[in-house]
């Protein structure tokens, strides 16, 4: 909690409160991912104190505005999360203001949560950086894995082909 309090006390109003400290302490004892997320957030915060001290001093709404100032966001203002995510592991997000959020949804998470080690390990291997225009063995492996899962309770996949897109706002 001391690490979170350092983030919380740096300056600027907090909009997103997250879980109360007693709940955070209880879950941190039960789920190592939460403790790892808090430690990672503290390390990143320490780095940001030198790199972006003015950002850290802003109110949470000001931080959001500054972080996304140079981007077109296709979502309505009330659909944008009211915090800046600093670190995350499993279902846990630690915000730039030191709040802890439980988040099990979101684009691309595939039920694996934030920063899943299996995905990081796969991405850390050398890969041909190509899209569908360049045939690649990763495409075959992906198709085989998907076809094994989709329709497995009925004996075969109901789809003849796969179509891969980015998330809706990017497609």
Q: Which residue stretches match the model-derived regions?
A:
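Short, compositionally biased leader-like segments
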Residues: 2-77
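Glycine-rich loop-to-alpha-helix module at the N-terminal edge of alpha/beta enzyme cores
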Residues: 5-31, 71-74, 92, 100-171
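Short loop/turn motifs at secondary-structure junctions and domain boundaries
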Residues: 80-89
């Amino acid at each position: 909690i001391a690490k979170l309090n350092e983030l919380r006390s740096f300056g600027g109003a907090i909009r997103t409160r997250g879980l109360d400290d007693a709940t955070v302490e209880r879950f941190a004892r039960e789920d190592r991912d939460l403790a790892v997320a808090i430690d990672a957030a503290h390390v990143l915060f320490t780095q940001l104190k030198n790199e972006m001290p003015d950002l850290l001093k802003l109110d949470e709404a000001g931080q959001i505005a500054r972080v996304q100032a140079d981007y077109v966001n296709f979502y309505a203002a009330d659909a944008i999360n009211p915090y800046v995510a600093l670190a995350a592991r499993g279902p846990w997000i630690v915000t730039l203001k030191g709040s802890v959020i439980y988040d099990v949804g979101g684009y691309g998470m595939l039920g694996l949560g934030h920063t899943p080690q299996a995905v990081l390990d796969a991405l850390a291997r050398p890969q041909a950086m190509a899209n569908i225009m360049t045939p690649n063995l990763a495409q075959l492996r992906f198709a085989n894995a998907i076809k094994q899962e989709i329709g497995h309770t009925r004996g075969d996949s109901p789809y003849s082909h796969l179509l891969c897109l980015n998330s809706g706002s990017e497609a």
